């Protein structure tokens, strides 16, 4: 089954062997769309969620055309975080495992926080593939230790995170050193307006491939919807965390400033809290990730973009401090829990202003929320969120009908409004009784 489905894309034998060992049964949705387009040499903007098979969607077809006899860089892959760059590099190692001895494909992982001089030494023999963070790759190119002028393909992974962390300028400088007929493959959960000038500069008529997020209502995730009711939201989150007693909980905020406010507020209330956002220095980020992996934190506050480039294991609870401004981020957030067969709880705190976004999540993403509130130490069922509005609707219809029957007189007298309202109320009561 594996061989049949992947061989239809004319992948070389070493890739088919690797796919078989990785136990891939059939190409995912994004892979089926990306493989033929990349093969044609077309530039691509790909949008898909975590866990969609995106990394292999771009690795398989680009590795397939590496010419091992040419000792020069043929493929550049940029990632916004060291952790993600390392993950991609490890996948390349797995996929090139079955190369013939005289056809070995070489790759280097070039990231900040490592000995740059040592990297320069290793680059005396240029690899076929470089994967790394934009800053380190750019530095090595500018120091003429790394030569990318013959590489026809560049992959920009998690592009919106690149933008958020200020790395797009570095990617721009790398791409500027590459051939004019460059194939650029950009992968991003969203395409922010500020990213578009960069895309326009390097991509002529790119293929836009968008895979809709999977239905996240399925599986083992319970979705709680909690009204803020003008309460102190940090107090509310604090109470939730104490009530849940999570293995590991992540609180998502929409901005870096808000992440700091929530983290500081929870720490003031006695919780030991980790934080992940784009303003952390590389050293602080590395330290934070080590602490998280060593289970030093039970609670983490994060922004969408900074957390997306990191694989955090064992998340039992996700709390949305507010619904995300982009609904695709909701999928990325809640998909971090209930992995590998485990169950999870995703809580979304909302204000009346969020009603429209919640409607979209229910209709477009098929989320089934439990409308609840934390009262004391117990969760109370609040019933349907839309109950009040649906109750009001018949009255609206009666008002319209009564206004048509009893019209405002052309010549008005004092107190006419009160008399008009009384007469219309009589009509509404009469009509209402008939309906019963």
From Swiss-Prot:
Residues 405-419, 427-436 have a biased composition (Basic residues). It is found in: Cytoplasm. Its EC number is 3.6.4.13. GO terms for molecular function: ATP binding; ATP hydrolysis activity; RNA helicase activity; RNA strand annealing activity. Disulfide bonds: none annotated. One of its GO terms (cellular component) is cytosol. This is DEAD-box ATP-dependent RNA helicase CshB. The gene is cshB.
């Amino acid at each position: 089954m594996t061989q049949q489905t992947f061989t239809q894309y004319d992948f070389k034998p070493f890739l088919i062997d690797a796919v078989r060992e990785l136990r891939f049964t059939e190409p995912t949705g994004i892979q089926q769309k990306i493989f033929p387009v990349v093969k044609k040499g077309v530039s691509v903007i790909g949008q898909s969620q975590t866990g969609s098979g995106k990394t292999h969607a771009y690795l398989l077809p680009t590795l397939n055309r590496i010419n091992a006899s040419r000792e020069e860089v043929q493929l550049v892959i940029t990632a916004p975080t060291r952790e993600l760059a390392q993950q991609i590099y490890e996948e390349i190692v797995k996929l090139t495992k079955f190369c013939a001895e005289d056809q070995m494909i070489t790759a280097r992982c070039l990231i900040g926080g490592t000995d740059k001089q040592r990297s320069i030494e290793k680059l005396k023999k240029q690899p076929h593939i470089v994967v790394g963070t934009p800053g380190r790759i750019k530095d090595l190119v500018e120091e003429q230790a790394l030569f990318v002028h013959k590489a026809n393909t560049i992959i920009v992974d998690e592009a919106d995170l690149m933008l958020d962390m200020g790395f797009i300028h570095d990617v721009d400088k790398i791409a500027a050193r590459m051939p004019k007929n460059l194939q650029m493959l950009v992968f991003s959960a969203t395409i922010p307006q500020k990213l578009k000038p960069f895309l326009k500069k390097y991509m002529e008529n790119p293929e836009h491939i968008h895979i809709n997020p999977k239905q996240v209502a399925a599986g083992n995730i319970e979705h709680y919807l909690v009204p803020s009711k003008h309460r102190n939201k940090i107090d509310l989150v604090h109470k939730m965390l104490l009530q849940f007693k999570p293995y590991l909980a992540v609180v998502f905020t929409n901005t870096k400033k808000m992440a700091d406010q929530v983290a500081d507020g929870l720490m003031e209330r006695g919780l030991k809290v980790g934080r992940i956002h784009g303003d952390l220095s590389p050293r602080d980020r590395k330290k934070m990730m080590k602490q998280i992996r060593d289970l030093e934190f039970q609670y983490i506050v994060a922004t969408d973009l900074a957390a997306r480039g990191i694989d955090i294991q064992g998340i039992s609870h996700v709390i949305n401090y507010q619904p995300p401004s982009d609904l695709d981020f909701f999928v990325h957030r809640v998909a971090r829990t209930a992995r590998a067969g485990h169950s999870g709880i995703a809580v979304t705190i909302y204000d009346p202003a969020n009603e429209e976004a919640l409607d979209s999540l229910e209709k477009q993403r098929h989320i089934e929320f439990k409308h609840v509130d934390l009262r004391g130490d117990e969760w109370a069922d609040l019933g349907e969120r839309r109950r009040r509005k649906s109750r009001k609707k018949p009255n609206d219809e009666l008002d319209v009908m009564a206004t048509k029957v009893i019209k405002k007189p052309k010549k008005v007298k004092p107190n006419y409004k009160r008399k008009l309202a009384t007469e219309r109320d009589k009509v509404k009561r009469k009509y209402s009784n008939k309906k019963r």
